[in-house]
Amino acid sequence: MFYFSEIEGKRILKSDLIKNAEAFFTTRDICICYKSEDIQNDVQNTIESNKKIICDSLKIERENLLFPTQTHTSHIEITKKNIKNYPDTDALVLAEKNLGIFLNFADCTPIILYDEAQNIGAIAHAGWRGTAGNIASKTVQKMIDEFNSKPENIVALIGPAIGFCCYNVGEEVYQKLSKTVSNFERLYEIREGNIFVDLKNINKRQLEEIGVQKIDVCPYCTVHNNNLFYSYRNENATPYRHSAVLKLN
């Protein structure tokens, strides 16, 4: 079950499914910017301060907080302390202690994975392109291939994202998503001639089909809860983001 907590008086969203790692989703209280060149210096200072808040909560140095350049792909990388740049990457696998990872979101689906037995984890960024590319299940497969994870030991948190209520798509996107899981008829609806898809539960189904059983799906829609989370669609392509954060204990 998801619940709100705080770090330095700023709201974050956690799940009681993960107890042995630091895993949470930030809110608008901890603003991060996707394109720093689009913002003024005072906002940039706030964003750097917010990154420090995240680092302090994880008890790590700023240089040990790693994040990729997200490009709406299904490319996955394994983090290493001596590698700071992860270009063209939409999922990071974390196997080292004293490192933190975070990815940024505004409507796309954030997925935190944690293997309780191996003490490794990952964060995946699943927009419609990543979802169509099965980034959730591919990240699990990476954990299996590289670290001998077993799906039954993996916990998945599917965080705040645009909901089934609001995510209408065109025919091309619908067709691509419909090929990623079985029984897709339960994951879309036609309303007044428009196609709506359930992106969070498509990712849940992908995880279930690779064997992940313990999955917590956040009920918050980023459009309907725009006071808590950023929404690309609802805020005229805002450059600001909330984040998914993970550190191993």
Where does each model-flagged region fall?
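Active-site microenvironment for binding and transforming phosphate-containing groups
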Residues: 1-249
